[in-house]
């Protein structure tokens, strides 16, 4: 077994907490945890600790929550810990070069894509929307660029036809910690091999917006169905009926060669609500109307049949 590393962990959401849990269970020593400051959450806007902070406190690991690393105090706090390595997973703060240079072995990051494809904030969602056959995690040595560092380990898995961003998030949250612990063993014993990224193959996974999630009926049905899966659980693909926003939870593609205007309902029964698109038809199987939970199409038609009459146009 390789020599234990003195590790600082930096992360914030549940995805990061699962990686921290794997480090705690490994033979390495987590000497400190950095996470975003407590934020207001819930209806009462009560200050709430991040999942990473909660896990660290459960294991009596010191927690640090700077707003940024601009102050000399924050930088010195990091220096004083004398870490071998910093592991960064969905931290949410930009790390200046001075921070990247502080640990003896620098900083590594777990990124939710097969780099250099899908650098940026929303790699899981963009990979589904693009119709990629696979995705994975890349563990890279961090540099000052946006997900541009040398790659140390890549682990992949297929994107299934029914995968949503929610399901892929869970799968990568299982894949990532295993790859991370393996990578740490390689770093500790000196066998890790850094591979440079090919910048010509890179593309950018920009943050999602609610505007993108509004269905464009002129797109082909395959693209719309991918959007439905990519935007689940947020911001949710949606369309409008009588100024009511309807969220789409589940859909499928059916062949259609008619000439109905995109956005027109061409069939509505217990098998689904069929809507013409730029190519073929998108069939809605599960929808959510305002103020209600997601419902199967039969329940929707029983309660809102007038909204989904054949010939109606959706916005």
UniProtKB/Swiss-Prot annotation:
InterPro entries: Fmt, Formyl_trans_C, Formyl_trans_C_sf, Formyl_transf_N, Formyl_transf_N_sf, Formyl_transferase-like_C_sf, GART_AS, Met-tRNA-FMT_C. Its EC number is 2.1.2.9. One of its GO terms (cellular component) is cytosol. Keywords: Protein biosynthesis, Transferase. This is Methionyl-tRNA formyltransferase. The gene is fmt. NCBIfam families: fmt. It catalyses: L-methionyl-tRNA(fMet) + (6R)-10-formyltetrahydrofolate = N-formyl-L-methionyl-tRNA(fMet) + (6S)-5,6,7,8-tetrahydrofolate + H(+). GO terms for molecular function: methionyl-tRNA formyltransferase activity. Belongs to the Fmt family. Disulfide bonds: none annotated. Gene3D superfamilies: Formyl transferase, C-terminal domain (3.10.25.10), Formyl transferase, N-terminal domain (3.40.50.170). It is an enzyme of class 2 (transferase). Attaches a formyl group to the free amino group of methionyl-tRNA(fMet). The formyl group appears to play a dual role in the initiator identity of N-formylmethionyl-tRNA by promoting its recognition by IF2 and preventing the misappropriation of this tRNA by the elongation apparatus. Signal peptide: none annotated. SUPFAM superfamilies: FMT C-terminal domain-like (SSF50486), Formyltransferase (SSF53328). (6S)-5,6,7,8-tetrahydrofolate binds at residues 113-116.
């Amino acid at each position: 077994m390789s020599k234990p590393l003195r590790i600082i962990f930096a992360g914030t959401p549940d995805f990061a907490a699962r990686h921290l849990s794997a480090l705690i269970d490994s033979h390495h020593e987590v000497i400190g945890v950095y996470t975003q400051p407590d934020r207001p959450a819930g209806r009462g806007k009560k200050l709430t600790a991040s999942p990473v902070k909660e896990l660290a406190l459960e294991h009596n690991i010191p927690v640090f929550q700077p707003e940024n690393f601009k102050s000399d105090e924050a930088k010195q706090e990091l220096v004083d810990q004398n870490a071998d390595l910093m592991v960064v997973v969905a931290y949410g703060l930009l790390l200046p070069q001075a921070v990247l240079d502080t640990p003896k072995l620098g900083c590594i990051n777990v990124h939710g894509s097969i780099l250099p494809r899908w650098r940026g904030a929303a790699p899981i969602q963009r990979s589904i929307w693009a119709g990629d056959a696979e995705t994975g995690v890349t563990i890279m040595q961090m540099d000052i660029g946006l997900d541009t560092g040398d790659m140390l380990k890549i682990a992949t898995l297929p994107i299934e036809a029914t995968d949503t961003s929610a399901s892929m998030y869970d799968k990568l949250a299982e894949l990532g910690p295993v790859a991370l612990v393996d990578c740490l063993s390689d770093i500790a014993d000196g066998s890790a091999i850094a591979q440079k990224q090919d910048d010509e193959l890179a593309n950018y996974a920009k943050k999602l917006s609610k505007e993108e999630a509004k269905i464009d009926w002129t797109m082909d049905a395959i693209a719309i169905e991918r959007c439905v899966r990519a935007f689940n659980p947020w911001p949710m693909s949606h369309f409008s009926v009588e100024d009511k926003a309807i969220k789409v939870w589940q859909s499928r593609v059916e062949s259609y060669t008619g000439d109905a205007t995109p956005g027109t309902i061409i069939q509505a029964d217990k098998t689904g609500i069929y809507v013409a698109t730029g190519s073929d038809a998108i069939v809605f199987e599960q929808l959510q109307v305002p103020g209600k939970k997601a419902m199967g199409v039969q329940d929707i038609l029983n309660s809102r049949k007038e909204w989904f009459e054949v010939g109606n146009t959706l916005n």
